[in-house]
Design a protein with these regions (language model features):
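Short juxta-domain linker segments that transition from a proline/glycine-rich
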Residues: 10, 25-32, 39, 43, ...
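Short, intrinsically disordered or compositionally biased N-terminal tails of bacterial proteins
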Residues: 1-24
Length: 516
């Protein structure tokens, strides 16, 4: 019976997927017809009114067709073909003229689906209409973008995540409306904001107010789900399945996210609590909003600001301050740094920073950048993801290497490795004070994660962080990746400067040509 149900679910999934593909195809056909109609009309120097008279169709209807919103019936297409002096088959053909071919390829690819145009106030049909009026040069540019996307295997996942990162940076990674929603939530449900917030009090709201069932047992029945943190099964009584192996901080964080989805009335969301299942921009954005809400709920704004003020007021660097604050709120290191990043510009004027999260696995020397926010700075770590040879002098990578060596297969998932560095980017005047925390991942003892926040060193930082020049803080020259770095005495180098040598060779050739 169980296998039969699974087969039915798979069939339903295929039907839904095919229906979505069919809808996309229909939209594509409508847009192509609109482009062709507009081009043919303009080639014949006809206004919409003139074409309306010739075809006996209304101006408004023709306008809807050209915008890709309507697809006329066969007899109306025949009227249009006769009015334009073209064959019926030529008008309905999906083949476009040479200058419009790149637009057809753009529509036929999944690139436009990756771009969250609606979130930036851009209407897809208007965008296509503008492109149809473009010059041959712009058409060539579109074709180039498509080729670049194909050659670099640009994925929807990368596109959406890049769009989200830019969205956060545009808003300075701070959202007052979410902050106010959290304050209202605390008042409405009469919660005590003093840390740590009670797990039972928050789950009680989910159960009583939103009719949830919380299940921490069923996960053990499926070994395939061990890497996931939680799954929501929607229904009249939603069931939240939580991975029982999560830490208390991780569980309450998920509870906070579920409260956010319900309280903020967010419906377009992923039901799986895992970054592996966040591919569309809407899911990514709403996941970020719910995570922001949960973090702001668990790390109370006023109390957290007071704790950070005390931390920044210290004359000497002391890693215990960070550990104590994390433990006080029963938070994860990422929640701590995320909250600090959200508030740093608004509260302390520290609005120039790098936020980085790296993952690594035992037995490898690979470090993957899995989350990044860069605010008002020149450095671009994520722009070099292809090589993976990030500078091994970064504090986030340095402490990952140390914790891997220290544990060496030992299960010590609560242990935190804290680091700090005063760094200067090679051949620039850009300096940073960076803090980082690394931990063994709670669901896999062979996997490790570090989170780092690096503030740009300027007069504002010097006025706020009193221990910035503590001699105990090591100073290091760093770079982006080994591929573009010409430091000759770097003991941490993981790769030869291959890219830099190619660039230098090209420059040498150019200089030689100029001397001829």
């Amino acid at each position: 019976m169980k296998k039969f149900c699974n087969v039915i679910l798979i069939i339903l999934y295929i039907i839904i997927a095919e229906r979505n593909n069919l809808d996309n195809k229909r939209n594509y056909i409508k847009l192509i017809l609109g482009l062709k109609l507009k081009q043919l009309r303009q080639e014949r120097h006809l206004s919409l009114n003139e074409l309306a008279e010739r075809s006996s169709l209304s101006v408004s209807y023709l306008n809807e067709i050209e915008k890709g919103k309507k697809y006329p019936k066969a007899e109306k297409i025949a009227q249009l073909a006769q009015a334009l002096g073209v064959k019926y088959d030529a008008l309905i053909s999906l083949k476009l003229t040479k200058n419009l071919t790149p637009i057809a390829e753009l529509l036929d690819s999944n690139i436009l689906e990756m771009l969250p145009l609606d979130h930036y106030g851009i209407d897809l049909n208007k965008f296509i209409s503008l492109m149809s009026d473009a010059s041959y040069q712009l058409s060539a540019l579109v074709a180039t973008v498509i080729e670049l996307a194909r050659s670099s295997e640009m994925s929807q996942n990368n596109f959406s995540r890049t769009a989200l990162r830019i969205y956060k940076e545009i808003n300075d990674n701070y959202f007052e409306e979410i902050e106010q929603s959290v304050i209202k939530f605390i008042e409405e449900f009469k919660l005590d904001p003093a840390p740590p917030l009670s797990y039972n009090s928050l789950t009680s709201i989910l159960i009583k107010k939103y009719n949830y069932i919380i299940d921490e047992i069923r996960f053990n029945d499926f070994d395939e789900l061990k890497e996931l943190r939680g799954i929501l099964k929607p229904g009249k009584r939603p069931i939240l399945f939580l991975n029982p192996h999560l830490s208390g901080a991780q569980k309450i964080f998920i509870i906070g996210k579920e409260l956010a989805y319900n309280y903020l009335k967010i419906t377009n969301r992923s039901n799986v609590h895992s970054s592996l299942k966040l591919n569309t921009f809407d899911h990514l954005l709403n996941n970020y909003i719910s995570a922001y809400f949960s973090t702001a709920l668990l790390l109370n704004r006023d109390l957290f600001i007071n704790d950070i003020n005390n931390f920044f007021a210290q004359e000497k660097w002391d890693e215990k301050f960070i550990i104590n604050i994390i433990k006080k709120y029963d938070a994860t290191p990422e929640m701590f740094f995320q909250r600090l990043a959200n508030l740093s510009g608004k509260v302390w004027g520290l609005n120039k920073y790098l936020f980085l999260r790296f993952n690594t696995i035992s037995g490898t020397d690979r470090f993957d950048l899995t989350k990044e926010v860069r605010l008002n700075i020149n450095q671009n770590p994520g722009g070099y993801q292809a090589s993976g040879y990030y500078c091994r002098r970064w504090i986030s990578i340095e402490i990952l290497k140390k914790i891997k060596e220290e544990l060496n297969g030992i299960d010590s998932r609560g242990k935190m490795k804290v680091g700090v560095v005063h760094s200067k980017f090679h051949e620039t005047e850009d300096e940073y004070i960076s803090f980082a925390v690394a931990q063994q991942n709670i669901l896999d003892k062979n996997s490790f994660t570090s989170v780092a926040l690096g503030f740009y060193l300027d007069d504002q930082l010097k006025s706020k962080i009193k221990f910035w020049n503590d001699l105990k803080i090591p100073f290091k020259i760093v770079n982006i990746t080994c591929d573009i770095c010409d430091l000759s005495d770097c003991k941490e180098r993981a790769s030869e400067p291959i890219t830099l040598r190619k660039i230098q060779r090209s420059l040498n050739i150019e200089n030689a040509i100029k001397k001829l």
